């Protein structure tokens, strides 16, 4: 498995901090406090996107990393809106660099697959950014396994490759186990999964009657509204209480403990909310505990759907 390094050659942290809340649910003061907490916990990998909080996320992150840029692995994303054409990617990336106040970034993702743009145009653009020293690594987010392989074959013909993928993955969203993780291992691609807490479901707060994205955002409610998912969250909270460990810590550490060695993206609205996820950075999960947690949710069927041979 490929391991990423900062520009100074230091391996990046095994946990990534996502800044989607910066400048939105977290104001500048709260955002800076979370950034400092992440750095104090040893996190060096920070993830953002051109459109997060209408650009405020990149602007704040750019300010925070400036005093120690060489120690930070900086990732951002383009193409969630407007597609993966050269013109749109270039316009977005120019906007990224302006908002971040950076000439270059370590990792640039295409935020999602674009059915309407030839992948050769997309990856010719990526390769050009690399050759000009504007990016070090290439990533794709929200791609299916076949899309990753098709893109990888084109990238390799252009003399480059996909270095990182960013799929959704958590105890209640395990589809990535079916083919995406295997593709990544086969192609030596680093896995940086998002939403290890299942939109906050796995913190246990919804079982306590609290509110959050699942109650406030119809997209998240639709994503995590199945009864078995809520049962899994309740059972994880019970397990956490039994072993005196916050369920959020267990959820993030479980993702990181997968044999494919993913590096989960954590986030929060405040340092208090962030703390249990940060604790996973140094949490050692035994094989027995990993298996116990795995059994709390439904395993996806194999790609062949031959369950008797799984």
Each language-model region and where it sits:
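Active-site beta-loop-alpha junctions enriched in small/polar residues
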Residues: 20-22, 49-51, 77-81, 110-113, ...
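Acidic (Asp/Glu)-rich catalytic clusters
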Residues: 7, 40, 62-70, 94-101, ...
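Beta/alpha (TIM)-barrel catalytic core signal, keyed to glycine-rich beta->alpha loops juxtaposed to Asp/Glu
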Residues: 3, 119-296, 300, 307-310
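Hydrophobic faces of well-ordered beta-strands that scaffold small-molecule active sites
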Residues: 13-18, 46-48, 74-76, 105-110, ...
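Active-site groove signature of glycoside hydrolases
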Residues: 97-116
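Short, acidic/polar
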Residues: 26-38, 85-100, 123-124, 148-152
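Structural motif corresponding to the early beta-alpha repeats
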Residues: 67, 71-87, 111-112
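N-terminal binding-site loop/beta-alpha segment at the start of enzyme catalytic domains
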Residues: 1-72
């Amino acid at each position: 498995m490929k391991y990423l390094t900062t520009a100074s050659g230091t391996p990046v942290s095994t946990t990534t901090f996502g800044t989607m809340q910066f400048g939105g649910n977290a104001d500048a003061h709260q955002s800076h406090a979370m950034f400092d907490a992440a750095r104090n916990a040893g996190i060096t990998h920070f993830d953002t996107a051109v459109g997060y909080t209408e650009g405020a996320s990149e602007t704040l992150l750019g300010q925070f990393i400036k005093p120690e840029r060489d120690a930070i692995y900086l990732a951002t994303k383009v193409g969630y809106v407007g597609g993966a054409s050269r013109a749109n990617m270039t316009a977005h990336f120019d906007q990224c660099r302006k908002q971040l106040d950076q000439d270059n970034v370590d990792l640039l993702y295409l935020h999602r697959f674009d059915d309407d743009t030839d992948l050769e145009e997309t990856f010719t653009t990526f390769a050009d950014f690399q050759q000009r020293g504007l990016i070090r690594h290439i990533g794709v987010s929200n791609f299916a396994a076949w899309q990753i392989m098709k893109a990888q074959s084109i990238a390799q013909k252009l003399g480059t490759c996909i270095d990182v993928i960013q799929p959704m993955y958590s105890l209640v969203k395990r589809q990535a186990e079916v083919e995406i993780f295997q593709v990544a291992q086969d192609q030596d691609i680093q896995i940086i999964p998002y939403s290890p807490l299942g939109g906050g479901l796995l913190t246990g707060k919804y079982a306590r009657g609290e509110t959050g994205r699942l109650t406030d955002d119809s997209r998240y409610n639709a994503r995590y509204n199945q009864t078995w998912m809520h049962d899994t969250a309740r059972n994880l909270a019970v397990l956490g209480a039994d072993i005196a460990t916050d369920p959020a810590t267990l959820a993030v550490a479980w993702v990181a403990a997968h044999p494919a060695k993913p590096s989960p993206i954590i986030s929060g609205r405040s340092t208090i909310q962030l703390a249990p996820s940060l604790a996973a950075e140094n949490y050692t999960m035994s094989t027995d505990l990993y298996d116990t947690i795995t059994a709390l949710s439904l395993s996806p069927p194999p790609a062949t759907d031959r369950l008797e041979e799984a």
